């Protein structure tokens, strides 16, 4: 009898532990879901860590080929808010798959979007205005989606995120976190401006053209190796190298998710070191600061 009582107590304890692990505080549901890591940083700074934030695209994955799992779709359905750039293919598909359309917020609203991913043959200053609904076209449809790589665009995105969060959490006051974030983005803007004004050259070579908004903001020239997702021909590589030498380029940037074969060839012929960057890292302020240093100092 005593043995049976002990067994029942043990079963009850294990059951309680299992229930806690599955649905208790140990694994809280994410209240806000974001599409990519840099957006999580914005939300966490605004809410000062008071809200659980989940990210769809895992570290090291490419948003261009990403497709959410059924489990992630369940998390999206259970979240209060879904914040996206509004410019990547899978984000557009999400809008068609979720039940509550009002929970999905496009943070590109108000951003002056760049037409196309500029290659080495295109001027970085040509751009056009687009309405918010047009933001759902992915980059291969003619819109550069990398709006989180420039302080000036980040400020617009932060404002959009704050307004959406304030609307969905009317009893909470996140103004202090928002203002603190905006102050840091203003400081980052000033840092970038000063660094590029003091630089010997305003041109840089990059494998995948992810810095078009940064280039536009500070009068830089982005010379891209890849064009429309395709590796360049030998003739195009020669043109890139000639253009880079003519403009005194000191650095070649590449992202970890792209092949290094072409990067190494171009870097060797240019006589510069290839430097790895990660525009999708969680902290966009530190990421932009490091990219600015690499471009302006060439090392």
Label the model's feature ranges.
Residues 1-9:
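Bacterial N-terminal signal peptides that target proteins for export
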Residues 18-299:
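Extracytoplasmic metal-acquisition and chelation regions
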Residues 9-20:
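Bacterial N-terminal signal peptides
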């Amino acid at each position: 009898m005593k043995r049976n009582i002990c067994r029942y107590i043990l079963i009850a304890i294990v059951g309680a532990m299992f229930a806690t692990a599955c649905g208790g505080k140990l694994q809280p549901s994410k209240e806000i879901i974001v599409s990519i890591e840099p957006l999580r940083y914005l939300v966490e700074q605004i809410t000062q860590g008071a809200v659980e934030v989940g990210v769809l695209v895992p570290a090291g994955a490419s948003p261009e080929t990403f497709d959410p799992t059924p489990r992630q779709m369940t998390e999206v359905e259970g979240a209060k808010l879904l914040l996206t750039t509004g410019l990547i293919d899978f984000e557009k598909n999400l809008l068609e798959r979720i039940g509550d359309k009002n929970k999905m917020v496009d943070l590109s609203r108000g951003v002056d979007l760049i037409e196309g991913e500029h290659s080495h043959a295109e001027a970085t200053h040509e751009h056009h205005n687009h309405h918010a609904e047009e933001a759902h076209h992915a980059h291969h449809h003619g819109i550069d989606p990398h709006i989180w790589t420039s302080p000036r665009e980040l400020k617009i995105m932060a404002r959009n995120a704050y307004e959406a969060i304030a609307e969905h959490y009317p009893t909470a006051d996140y103004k202090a976190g928002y203002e603190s974030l905006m102050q840091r983005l203003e400081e980052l803007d000033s840092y970038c401006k000063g660094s590029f004004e003091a630089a010997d050259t305003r041109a840089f070579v990059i494998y995948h053209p992810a810095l078009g908004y940064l280039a536009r903001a500070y009068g830089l020239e982005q010379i891209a190796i890849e064009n429309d997702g395709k590796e360049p021909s030998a003739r195009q590589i020669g043109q890139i190298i000639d253009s880079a030498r003519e403009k005194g380029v000191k650095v070649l940037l590449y992202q970890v998710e792209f092949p290094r074969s072409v990067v190494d060839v171009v870097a060797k012929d240019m006589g510069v070191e290839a430097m790895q960057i990660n525009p999708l890292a969680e902290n966009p302020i530190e990421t932009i600061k490091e990219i600015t240093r690499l471009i302006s100092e060439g090392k």
